[in-house]
A protein has these predicted regions:
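Active-site-adjacent pocket-lining segments in enzyme domains
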Residues: 1-93
Length: 93
């Protein structure tokens, strides 16, 4: 995977990796992200092909849980969330 969180999208966009794709970032940077010919989605985590983007910095937790869910399953991701006392249903990420 290639990932970007918050304004980290700029590196991916400058490299041309986001052109024509769906992605997210912190809400104040939606217009800047859209200027790179990206379909901006107001979600915490967006996964398209091998690229995963997260919204604000705190979305990094949900992005990490999402990757655990994708690679190791819901049970592992939910256990990780519970272990760090992060109240979330990982099936909704």
């Amino acid at each position: 995977y290639v990932m970007g969180i918050c304004n980290g999208f700029q590196i991916l966009a400058e490299a041309g990796l986001l052109t024509g794709k769906k992605a997210t970032t912190y809400h104040t940077a939606f217009e800047e992200l859209a200027a790179y010919s990206v379909e901006v989605l107001p979600q915490k985590v967006v996964h398209e092909n091998n690229i995963i983007t997260g919204a604000g910095v705190s979305s990094g937790i949900e992005l990490g849980l999402y990757i655990l869910k994708e690679e190791f399953g819901v049970a592992v991701a939910q256990q990780a969330a519970d272990n760090i006392e992060y109240a979330i249903d990982v099936t909704k990420i």
